[in-house]
Amino acid sequence: MCYLYRNAIELGLKRLIIEDSHIDSSKAFKIIRNKKHSILGLWNSIIDEVKKYVNMPDDITLDNLQQYIKAFHNFDKSSDLFRYPCDKDMSPYFIEPKKLDIENVAFCFEELCNFLAYVSSILNEIKDYESDMMVDMKDCYGIIL
């Protein structure tokens, strides 16, 4: 379950970068290729745009989300921890049994997934609005941007 949640976060961040951001597609794909499975690296690639369009003054939501992302990244940097029982050198990831507060972990992951979906919808709306504005500028004034 933890792997699937983590993977959902990774894919949500990649969706923001490729589909919803103002990053041109060649640069977006380069970011994805370079950052691979690093949710912190992916987040750092999109945070400026998120701050520009989504952040409200005195809102601590982004700070809280950044803490979630850092915690999840630090716990499973390569996205292997919950996918495989051991690393490439055959050393087990968990020698001692680990007990997780699964309800709390699930809550944090779901909050992060919900926020990424919210950011996606906001950035998508902004891009649609900008596209409509360009069409209007062309139709009304003959201006092509």
Sequence positions of predicted segments:
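Domain-scale activation on soluble regions of proteins
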Residues: 1-145
